[in-house]
Amino acid sequence: ARRTLFRYAAAGVATSLVSPRLLAQEKAIEALQSITRDVTPIGKAERADRLARAQKMMQAQGIDALLVEPGASLIYYSGIRWWRSERLTALVIPASGTPLAVCPFFEKRSIDESLAIPAEVRVWQEHESPYAPIADYLKARGLDKGRIGIEETVRYFAVDGLKAALPAATLVKDPVTRAIRMRKTAAEIALMQKAADVTMGAYRWTHPQVKAGMTPADIGALMSAATSALGGKGEFNLILLGEAAAYPHGSGKPQSVRAGEVVLMDCGCTVEDYQSDISRTFVYGAAPTAQQRKVWDEVAQGQQVAIRAAKLGVAAGTVDDAVRTYYEKLGYGPGYKPPGLSHRTGHGIGMEGHEPVNLVHGETTK
């Protein structure tokens, strides 16, 4: 934590802010202790259950296999943490039986090391087609003329290559992965809660450290240091000051903390692959004006409207409708027109900061 704080300070904090203030911050952050040492990562039994649920759903929907590229879904199913490049690394999940992992020959040991499920691993050399091992695997199982589900983030060149290798197969949208990932288990919820606890702890530490003249980068450095000290992996720190707080994702104009102005912080972290995404708003160095308090109270009440509207069996879009109706009665909008709610009411979260389902007009998922 100490090294993190100094590194960010050296990169972004003005010299006039560093000396006594940074030393005080260093001392304060040393008092923070990790709160994630006792967390339980997703284990083999949970991943086995994920595969079993996926295969059961595939059989019910007539999907013979799924293709998954590196990213959250690959980690979700297999534990493989990998990056995307022009060299294909992928997981193929059959409707029954053992999955296949495909990777470049020289990466096999790394894939073996990170693989958290029973799976066959096949490789391809630099001069070979990476789709040949997949085609051979599916042909051996009589699936080369089947329906292959393509996970929604798979890149086009991978789809195109698979299509060429399996001309008789039918490539379709994966109807399984999103549906399974949307339903969080108790273990997943516990990790998400811990990530939220880390972010809230970082907020509580950072808030009193904010001083006049600080920039968004300065405040972000404090949040990053606190998040790391508390045992989280920082994902993002969006700090909006003054007028920029009116922009959902900020402004490129220079900003600094000034008394009486709004500080809006939108920050999140990861704990064992699961994320938090929490915003907090305050007025620095002065009591809020009547207008600032009025708008803050209206937004807080809008959140309560959303909570009351979000019930089991209710379409997600109706939550957005309820909140938008409330704001319009106050004179905001209409619709997305500012001043008012210029974006959807909310989004899902899990291994990614934005996941289905969205709280947005027209969303029928219940």
Which residue ranges define each predicted feature?
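Active-site neighborhoods and metal-handling regions in enzymes and metal-associated proteins
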Residues: 4-366
